[in-house]
């Protein structure tokens, strides 16, 4: 099965109550709930962490400062600025007490999206920020920021991606990316990718329905 569930609060029509229910649905499974928030701020991050998210994806990390803000929003003081609210999440993860939960919060995965030409230009500074676990290249927004909307295979987009890949591979963090097929996933693994997002809900439903109907005699 899947190792992690991508819950999208940036583009998806998902409020915090729905997010909490999705996180709770993973209880008892080996699938870790990871939530994409709207920006690297405590206001957006704290509720999803208090709901039990095991990872947070931050969009549009374009500078050292925004990367540092992402880390600060996830970590408790003194490493960060997250407020203390150990109520729902400890019960979700069966932590015996709040101190145990405080210590385990260091295991929350922080994922930085590299999805803008500004991020490419600042990639060396961004990848030096301690606390970011995964630097995830998002090609569609990146292509748009370069002026090639919808064309992730444009030479300039590929050049930008290659620059980011090379820098991330030398950093402390893992290299992540989107895959729209198993073959693309295998290619990325061969290229050093360690974290893969294997599609999304609408795509998976479309592929499943198409596969079923294509095999139907009608």
Model region roles, listed by residue range:
Residues 55-69, 82, 135-144, 193-212:
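Glycine-rich phosphate-binding active-site loops on the catalytic face of alpha/beta enzymes
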Residues 2-21, 137-153:
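Glycine-rich, proline-tolerant flexible connector loops at the mouths of alpha/beta enzymes
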Residues 41, 82-93, 108, 114-118, ...:
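C-terminal alpha-helical cap/extension of soluble enzyme domains
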Residues 1-4, 50-55, 75-76, 129-134, ...:
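Glycine-enriched alpha-helix->loop->beta-strand junction motifs that scaffold or abut catalytic
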Residues 43, 58-130, 144:
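Conserved anion-binding
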Residues 5-7, 33-37, 56-58, 110-115, ...:
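Hydrophobic faces of well-ordered beta-strands that scaffold small-molecule active sites
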Residues 8, 56, 70, 126, ...:
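Conserved, mostly hydrophobic/aromatic
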Residues 14-42, 46-50, 72-80, 102-105, ...:
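Alpha-helix-loop-beta-strand connector modules within alpha/beta enzyme cores
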